[in-house]
UniProtKB/Swiss-Prot annotation:
Keywords: Ribonucleoprotein, Ribosomal protein, RNA-binding, rRNA-binding
One Pfam family of this chain: Ribosomal_L6
Native organism taxonomy: Bacteria, Pseudomonadati, Aquificota, Aquificia, Aquificales
Identification of the protein by name: Large ribosomal subunit protein uL6
Entry's transmembrane regions: none
Listed HAMAP family: Ribosomal_uL6_B (MF_01365_B)
Function: This protein binds to the 23S rRNA, and is important in its secondary structure. It is located near the subunit interface in the base of the L7/L12 stalk, and near the tRNA binding site of the peptidyltransferase center.
Superkingdom of the source species: Bacteria
Gene name in the database record: rplF
Matching PROSITE patterns: RIBOSOMAL_L6_1
Quaternary structure note: Part of the 50S ribosomal subunit.
Any Gene Ontology biological process: cytoplasmic translation
GO molecular function list: rRNA binding; structural constituent of ribosome
Recorded family membership: Belongs to the universal ribosomal protein uL6 family.
PANTHER family: 60S/50S RIBOSOMAL PROTEIN L6/L9 (PTHR11655), LARGE RIBOSOMAL SUBUNIT PROTEIN UL6M (PTHR11655:SF14)
Amino acid sequence: MSRIGKKPIAIPNNVKVSLDGNVLTIEGPKGKLSMPVHEIVNVKIDNNQITVSKNQESPFAQAMHGTTAALIKNTIEGVSKGYSVTLEVVGLGYKAAMKGQELELNLGYSHPIYYKPPAGIKLEVKENKITVSGIDKQLVGQVAAEIIKFRKPDPYKGKGIRYEGQVLKLKPGKSAGKGKK
């Protein structure tokens, strides 16, 4: 049995959970999310708790047991508190700004890059820091990764877009001609 799946998931007072067939709908103060539940897993709602159990004993059932429990926990946290990721734009002349609903990035290319976030994602820019926020943890992480992909951190100078607080191990530059004969 999965360690994560064994523990019952507490439902906060401000969150409503309903199960319709194989679709679990979770609604909270920040919004509403629905997620499919695999038929190999049973979800039971009672006494402000959700319990997840598996139908059969197989490695796949065990994996889905833990995964489903973790996804439900993340969804409950998302609709009650929300998720956010902060990115830093580092580099001389590298800039980020919001133009209406689109994110405009100047990253040393000959043209600016425009990024329109998907529905449910909010972008904010303050002093070359981009904050990606939303209620879906997977979507917030995916959008942050897509923005980083426009200019990954350079391994020599550290220029580019990175997660806030991310420590880069910089490579040494060329050391040709120093002491060699």
